A protein has these predicted regions:
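Glycine-rich, mobile lid/loop segments that gate access to catalytic sites or pores
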Residues: 1-120, 246, 251-255, 266-292
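Conserved mixed alpha/beta catalytic, RNA-binding, or beta-rich assembly cores of soluble enzyme
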Residues: 7, 88, 129-180
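Internal helix-turn-beta structural module
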Residues: 181, 188-293
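Short beta-strand elements
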Residues: 1, 41-66, 122-143, 186, ...
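Short, charged, low-complexity patches
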Residues: 7-11, 15, 72, 76-80, ...
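ATP-dependent carboxylate activation and anion-phosphoryl transfer catalytic cores
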Residues: 62-69, 107, 114-121, 126, ...
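Flexible helix-coil linker/hinge segments at domain or subdomain boundaries
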Residues: 24-30, 89-97, 153-157, 166, ...
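Predominant activation on well-ordered alpha-helical scaffold segments within soluble catalytic domains
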Residues: 12-23, 80-89, 133, 137, ...
Length: 293
């Protein structure tokens, strides 16, 4: 979707940003010094009937904290005040899109630690935790999800590699101007390399004079979606996944970094690695040519 500069749903993008800034404040140790690592956020946005974001309705922030005051009400009031006056101004300062900033009005409802004090967190507070949160790892509930978690799977599993490929396709298609919003769904049969189906939904926001089914046919012509080809194209057989452990797998920054690895035999290897290859806008020109844009 073109809601944000990184082609992500604005609801998830803002929730992830709130969490990153909150973590920065905690690690700096200068303000909100009571913060602990466990935290979560949710952003609710009002949309028009045409699917355009209109305003932020609600922001929820729950954060673990030290028990720094004997009076629970006073402690919770302090946390909420700091969220409003320390956290949120820093969050807004990180946003460079006027379109996104315009969603912040004076009537936003803030719920900060709405269940009360949050001193015990992590596995200590919740036994029987789920695996990686697959919706937060993708699009925050917008669109659809195949149901398989990413973390823990090697890239031969289409649960992971094809989800990255679908993201790569949808992002490049929207960036090329084919549609303002697009869902790309790829279906596979076990033991069959070629996808059995490619489904596209532009939610009525296509910019080209063709059906979603015709767009899907163009995608199958432009992109090789066999698992081995996806691995090769997106360089998925590299040690590039540590950064996906927090803040989601989609909408992240594509960059080249240098990493140092040490084996059990104390051998050191330095590698230059490209992170989040599925976020590259490297097929925009090909798409424009194919669609005559």
């Amino acid at each position: 979707t073109n809601e944000t500069e990184n082609y992500m749903p604005v609801t998830l993008d803002l929730a992830q940003l709130i969490m990153r800034v909150l973590a920065d404040i905690r690690k700096e140790g200068k303000q909100m010094t009571y913060l602990r690592p466990d935290s979560k956020s949710q952003v609710t946005v009002e949309y028009s009937e045409e699917g355009i974001p209109q305003r932020i309705d609600t922001i929820v922030v729950s954060t673990q904290h030290d028990e720094f005051d004997d009076d629970d009400e006073r402690m919770l009031a302090k946390i909420k005040d700091d969220v409003l006056n320390i956290l949120m101004p820093r969050v807004k300062a990180e946003i460079h899109s006027e379109k996104v900033l315009s969603l912040f009005g004076d009537d936003i409802k803030y719920f900060v630690n709405p269940t009360g004090k949050f001193v015990i967190g992590g596995p200590h507070g919740d036994t029987g935790l789920t695996g990686r949160k697959i919706i937060v790892d993708t699009y925050g509930g917008k669109g659809a999800h195949g149901g398989g978690a990413f973390s823990g799977k090697d890239p031969s599993k289409v649960d992971r590699s094809a989800a990255y490929a679908a993201r790569h396709i949808a992002k490049n298609m929207v960036a090329a101007g084919v549609a303002d919003e697009m869902l790309v769904q790829v279906s596979y049969a076990i033991g069959v390399a070629e996808p059995v189906n490619i489904y596209v939904n532009t939610y009525g926001r296509s910019r080209v004079q063709m059906s979603d089914a015709e767009i899907a046919q163009k995608i199958s012509k432009l992109f090789d979606l066999r698992p081995k080809a996806i691995e090769r194209t997106l360089k998925l057989r590299q040690p590039i996944y540590r950064e996906t452990a927090a803040y989601g797998h989609m909408g992240r920054k594509n960059e080249i970094v240098e990493k140092t690895f040490t084996s059990r035999y104390h051998e050191t290897k330095v590698m230059k690695l490209e992170l989040f290859t599925w976020e590259k806008l490297d097929r925009v020109d090909d798409i424009k040519r194919e669609f005559g844009l």
